[in-house]
Amino acid sequence: MRPVALASERAGLHSIAIADSPLISRELFLSCAECLHETKSLNVMTAVTNPLTRHPSVAASAIATLCEMAPGRLLVGIATGDSAAWGAGLRPAKVSVLSDYIIALKQLLRGEVATWQGHEFSLHWDGYDPSLAPPIYVACAGPRVLRMAVEVADGIIPAMGYAPQNIAHVKQLVADACVEFERDIHEFAISWYAEFTFGESAEEVLKSHLGADSQWLVMGSTEGKLIPPEYIPLLKEMHADGHNLEVAYKDRERGEKLVQRAKSLGLYDWLYARASRLCGTPAEIGARLQSFQEQGLDHWCLWQDG
């Protein structure tokens, strides 16, 4: 991670995001520590951890240690659990479990007594400064997790589509939840998630990349995701083999296969319309980002594909 972190800092990026999928990548918090140690101003985000593979006391200890190492430079991203969960035979956490976990983390990091699964505990560190507690962002692909995040977290990382109706949907969900939970919408952060892929042209890249993580459309509930009902079984068919680490992460032809499946199932045009399509030359990606900025999307969590 060191070369990536140093290059990111030289390029002037705000943050580097590090995945938490222990069967396919190096340990999350050790990687965060390396990146923080080797840089001076770069922020580091866990993108994203989960409430399943670490007890909240373990996660809080790691997070607090990193915050002491590099005050103000850690961001915590969390979700219900993707490859870290299903790769180890676990199901994603229920929304209520994720909510309770975030609450417990925040309590511990504020130096308070936390409650988790019927047990109470707290940090007993000498000299711990609760003001170092980092913001917590929740990655979400649907309205239930988004609503919960507005209640208990500091921001979201939505992957809910980029057609105009998708963007409007996310903004309205956030606005409604801020009213419901009496949050100041101007203090709630949105860091939009999308893939980006460099290539000779956007047209060329899109032959082998969908430009979107369509598997999350059918992870968990499909309610409120703006999916035409007739597409739900087709999307499940398209991603039937997706919970296999070799298939999902090691097959170099995976993107092209998904494009062909989408076309054969009659899903391609719909998926294309809702995709971020951040692909092609730097100029093409920059122009696309500029068009999103004009719609008020000015903070991103980007995953480089390919």
Predicted regions, residues:
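Active-site mouth loops of central-metabolism enzymes
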Residues: 1, 47-56, 130-141, 196-199, ...
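Short, acidic/polar
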Residues: 1-7, 62, 140-148, 281-291
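N-terminal beta1-alpha1-beta2 module of alpha/beta enzyme domains
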Residues: 1-46, 134
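Acidic (Asp/Glu)-rich catalytic clusters
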Residues: 6-10, 32-43, 63-74, 150-151, ...
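Hydrophobic faces of well-ordered beta-strands that scaffold small-molecule active sites
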Residues: 16-18, 43-47, 74-78, 136-139, ...
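Acidic-and-aromatic substrate-binding clefts and catalytic sites of carbohydrate-active enzymes
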Residues: 20-27, 51-57, 163-168, 197-198, ...
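Alpha-helix-loop-beta-strand connector modules within alpha/beta enzyme cores
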Residues: 29-49, 53, 104, 108, ...
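An alpha-helical appendage that flanks or caps ligand/catalytic pockets
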Residues: 91-127, 167-291
